[in-house]
Amino acid sequence: LTGKAGTGKTTFLKRLREHTPKRMVVLAPTGIAAINAGGVTIHSFFQISFAPFVPETTFNSAQIQYRYSQEKRNIIRSMDLLVIDEISMVRADLLDAVDATLRRYRNREKPFGGVQLLMIGDLQQLAPVVRDSEWSLLRNYYETPYFFASRALRETTYMTIELEKVYRQNDTFFLSLLNKIRENKADDEVLNELNQRYQQGFQPPKEEGYIRLTTHNNQAQQVN
């Protein structure tokens, strides 16, 4: 399930949680994303190492011999639906590690152990984090670090649904500017319009709570 910001992906997930009769687990790649989705992190739930996962690992390998409690094993064996939010940030090897774990406790012959998988996110937002040292290993198994290179996912025939209507912004002209920037198609019209809004020397009143965006964490820390 995909769509640009403001199209209702998070709202859909909330409604799904409220109304689905399925036993559902909601995961996300980071702590902040997990809090926003009302779930936990992928690494926490499956107790997966942050080290790269080699997709040719066997089920008996120490790499996937996680010590789960009986309660966790019961949850894994009984879940009907696994939801992964902010899927754009999930690396292909992490998704294959999830697949290996689910196959171990569910059905070894089916991708993700036969569990229904719902991935939610926008590929034009945050990308997966992969260090050069990690990619030097993973590039032997994947064309790209993005989740869609997952070997398990390529064994499935999945459906893609895109939410198109933006509910967060009613100004159609401003929305068209944002979309051009999003698609790397910013032309002179876009740049001129944005530059007209620039106010040199503007000092926001503290009581109005303006948000200041910076390019680096240390700059944000200095401001704060």
List each language-model region with its residue ranges:
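Conserved ATP-binding/catalytic motifs of P-loop helicase motor domains
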Residues: 1-224
